[in-house]
């Protein structure tokens, strides 16, 4: 049976449940995923005075072909984007500034240091998102930044975050799509603290100072990101979920939920509906934690599908900003981007092809047998036929065909790098 015939047959199967496949494919086209640049160079960045990777973050593996220049990183991103259906965004950290061979401290960064990224994004029709980098730096070596007891160090990081928001505003204005500027800090303690309140008070005061700088929200959206623990902050993290949830609600900021930043038995999918009742928007960093915040490449697993279901069934595609955050240096880095991003898009398609109205009715009337049975049956409905058609229409390879492109690129480009 031809691929087109498989698609038409699958359309009929889904259509029996009142699911409009064509409408789902049109909706899917409109959903941008924010693809993190740091998978391409193992969270290295391009600072001239480069610090060791810190902040409780670790990248394992030594696969050949890592990008070592901005040009190489952009070229690799272009390759990945050519294999991923849809129009998307690229997420940058401050350490990816281009300073023309001059040492520019992070609190002195300006929009001009990202002009090449903006020109590139314009050329490819991409949005850009941004993050201040509060790790891998001499002034973060003791694991404290915005909550540091030393006012001078604290001010350095406050100024860096203010500079980052201005860069985000520049991105949004130039590219005519709001930039999400997200603040994550590594601050915490390895062992049990004797005072949990004071560092949080300092963090609150730092954030208040950062957000007091006026920025046009039409161009820049502010987000704050929590974490349960990191290497070196096992016992206490200043920016906990409760801290940022409260701060975001009170100050009208976005909460960003990273799927690897919670207890292993705690799921982000279970938080989305609760937060949508109280927040206009929220943001995600989709990752795959294996026993801890290991940032494995995202797979098409139960939690990814459940996150997609929560977004789609609650009609929140325009309220939940979806980004990625994983890094694996043990496999081809362009393949890592491709696998993870395609899986997120595939999960959204899966969620769009579910009879949500009927399932909700069964839940409301107490028919839990039908609810469970049908949800399980839909796991083996012909999603693959619809996905292949979508990829074909979006001019990207179907199924695993994209691996051929990766193999050619690896041989001709990646393995030539030294």
Curated annotation (Swiss-Prot):
Pfam families reported in the protein's UniProt record: RhaA
Protein name: L-rhamnose isomerase
Gene3D superfamilies: Divalent-metal-dependent TIM barrel enzymes (3.20.20.150)
Job of this protein: Catalyzes the interconversion of L-rhamnose and L-rhamnulose.
This protein's encoding gene: rhaA
Top-rank taxon, per record: Bacteria
Subcellular location: Cytoplasm
SUPFAM superfamilies: Xylose isomerase-like (SSF51658)
Enzyme nomenclature, EC number: 5.3.1.14
């Amino acid at each position: 049976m031809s691929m087109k015939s498989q698609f038409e047959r699958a359309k009929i199967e889904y259509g029996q449940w009142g699911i409009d496949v064509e409408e789902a494919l049109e909706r899917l086209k409109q959903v941008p995923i924010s693809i993190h640049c740091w998978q391409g160079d193992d969270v290295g960045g391009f600072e001239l005075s480069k610090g060791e990777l810190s902040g409780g973050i670790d990248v394992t593996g030594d696969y050949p072909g890592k990008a070592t220049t901005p040009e190489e990183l952009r070229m690799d991103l272009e390759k990945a984007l050519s294999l991923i259906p849809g129009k998307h965004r690229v997420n940058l950290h401050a350490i990816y500034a281009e300073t023309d061979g001059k040492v520019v401290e992070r609190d002195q960064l300006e929009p001009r240091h990202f002009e090449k990224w903006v020109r590139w994004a314009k050329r490819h029709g991409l949005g850009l998102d941004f993050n201040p980098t509060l790790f891998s730096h001499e002034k973060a070596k003791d694991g404290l930044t915005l909550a540091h007891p030393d006012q001078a160090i604290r001010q350095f990081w406050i100024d860096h975050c203010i500079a980052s928001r201005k860069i985000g505003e520049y991105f949004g204005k130039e590219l005519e799509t709001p930039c999400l500027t997200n603040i994550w800090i590594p601050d915490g303690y390895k062992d049990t603290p004797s005072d949990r309140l004071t560092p949080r008070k300092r963090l609150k005061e730092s954030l208040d100072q950062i957000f007091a700088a006026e920025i046009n929200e039409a161009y820049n959206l502010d987000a704050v990101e929590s974490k349960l623990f990191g290497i070196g902050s096992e016992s206490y993290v200043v920016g906990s979920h409760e801290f940022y949830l409260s701060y975001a609600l009170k100050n009208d900021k976005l909460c960003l939920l990273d799927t690897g930043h919670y207890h292993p038995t705690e799921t982000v999918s279970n938080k989305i509906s609760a937060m949508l009742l109280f927040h206009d928007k929220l943001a995600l960093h989709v990752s795959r934690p294996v026993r801890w915040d290991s940032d494995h490449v995202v797979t098409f697993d139960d939690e990814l599908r459940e996150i997609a279901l929560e977004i789609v069934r609650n009609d929140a595609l325009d309220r939940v900003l979806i980004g990625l955050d994983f890094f694996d240096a043990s496999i081809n880095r362009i393949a890592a981007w491709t696998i993870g991003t395609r899986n997120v898009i595939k999960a959204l398609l899966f969620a769009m092809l579910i009879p949500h109205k009927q399932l909700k009715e069964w839940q409301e009337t107490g028919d839990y047998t039908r609810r469970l049975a049908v949800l399980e049956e839909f796991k083996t409905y012909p999603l693959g036929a619809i996905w292949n058609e979508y990829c074909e229409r979006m001019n990207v390879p179907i199924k695993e065909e994209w691996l051929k492109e990766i193999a050619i690129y690896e041989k001709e480009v990646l393995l030539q790098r030294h």
